UniProtKB/Swiss-Prot annotation:
Cross-referenced PANTHER family: MITOCHONDRIAL DNA REPAIR PROTEIN RECA HOMOLOG-RELATED, RECA
Record keyword Glycoprotein present: no
Entry GO MF terms: ATP binding; ATP hydrolysis activity; ATP-dependent DNA damage sensor activity; damaged DNA binding; single-stranded DNA binding
Gene (UniProt): recA
UniProt-recorded name of the protein: Protein RecA
InterPro entries, per database record: AAA+_ATPase, DNA_recomb/repair_RecA, DNA_recomb/repair_RecA_CS, P-loop_NTPase, RecA-like_C, RecA-like_N, RecA_ATP-bd, RecA_C_sf
Protein source organism: Laribacter hongkongensis (strain HLHK9)
């Protein structure tokens, strides 16, 4: 077939597709919104934003955060919610575990009055609510806490000893098939928290696995493995956890990077502590003995005092953070970008006003 005949055949096929499935059902890459810059929401941790390679968690994607108990999974998700709310976003929390503490969420910076919360009875109900929120296009971040608590209706209505092999895995697989297209279209960030289980009889390799089957592993664009690696002490009192997060899967940047940060009890991720450490590493903050200095001005003796000084001077903390992000070539401090549906509504209202 000659080149001109090929082009004619392709043009005919494209016009037929558009006629049958609607305008925009197929187009060239440079004509689509796919080419737009990836929009991200900060995780609340500067180090983790850098490890993700794009400055935060990508919008329009599925993210899985898993780890052992008390490793900081819920804290990390609440920090993401707080960051999205700071930028004017709407967030929803599907609390399948019935364990969300509004007081703790408030301490992490979450605007509890503006947070949509659902405590569903069954796994089907939880995922249906999630799907309806995504399709509305009005929610920017949805957290599902957790996959392990998404109990199928058949299991709830059955007897305690009944066997329900693969029921939860089938539920997750079906839900994710429905969700992913809508998530991309509405530019929503959906985060699934997951727990760890042990595979019985594994002699070699890692015996750990996550609940809910394999579907989430495939559909997730980013998977984060979060672990508690130590305790933070002030005299004899433990005031927080040292935490390590490994990016085990990343479809938007190179994977397998990791970040370490402090989670302080009642405060969340210590952003100021990260700014000091990364500022010293990038030579934006000077360290001489126990003293820290910025632009020739001493900001504190010891990390705790320097952290306190930055907390009292947020403008300087933001200035140092901006320098670190610029040096690493990642964003994450940009203005909030509305979803495609919100943008369309805004342009329609502008046309109407004119």
């Amino acid at each position: 077939m000659a080149e001109t005949d090929k082009q004619k055949a392709l043009s005919a096929a494209l016009s037929q597709i558009e006629k049958q499935f609607g305008k925009g059902s197929i187009m060239r890459m440079n004509e689509t919104q796919v080419n737009d810059n990836l929009q991200v929401i900060s995780t609340g941790s500067l180090g983790l934003d850098m490890a993700l390679g794009v400055g935060g968690l990508p919008r329009g994607r599925v993210v899985e955060i898993y780890g052992p108990e008390s490793s900081g999974k819920t804290t990390l998700c609440l920090q993401v919610v707080a960051e999205a709310q700071k930028l004017g976003g709407t967030c929803a929390y599907i609390d399948a575990e019935n364990a969300l503490d509004p007081v703790y969420a408030g301490k992490l910076g979450v605007k509890v009055d503006d947070l949509l919360v659902s405590q569903p009875d069954t796994g089907e109900q939880a995922l249906e609510i999630c799907d309806m929120l995504v399709r509305s296009g009005g929610v920017d971040v949805i957290v599902v806490d957790s996959v392990a608590a998404l109990v199928p209706k058949a299991e709830i209505e059955g007897e305690m000893g009944d066997s329900h092999v693969g029921l939860q895995a089938r539920l997750m697989s079906q839900a994710l098939r429905k969700l992913t297209g809508n998530i991309k279209r509405t530019n929503t960030l959906v985060i699934f928290i997951n727990q760890i289980r042990m595979k019985i009889g594994v002699m070699f390799g890692n015996p750990e696995t996550t609940t809910g089957g394999n579907a989430l592993k495939f559909y997730a664009s980013v998977r984060l493995d979060i672990r508690r690696i130590g305790a933070i002490k002030k005299t004899d009192e433990i005031i927080g956890n040292e935490t390590r997060v490994k990016v085990v899967k990343n479809k938007v940047s190179p994977p397998f990077k990791q970040a370490e940060f402090d989670i302080l009890y009642g405060e969340g991720i210590s952003r100021e502590g990260e700014i000091i450490e990364m500022g010293v590493a990038n030579k934006f903050v000077d360290k001489s003995g126990a003293w820290y200095a910025y632009n020739g001005q001493k900001i504190g003796q010891g990390k705790d005092n320097a952290r306190e000084w930055l907390r009292e001077n947020p403008a300087i903390a933001q200035e140092i953070e901006k320098k670190i992000r610029t040096a690493a070539g990642v964003g994450g401090m940009n203005e909030f970008v509305p979803s495609s549906e919100e943008q369309a509504e805004a342009s329609l209202s502008e046309d109407h006003d004119q």
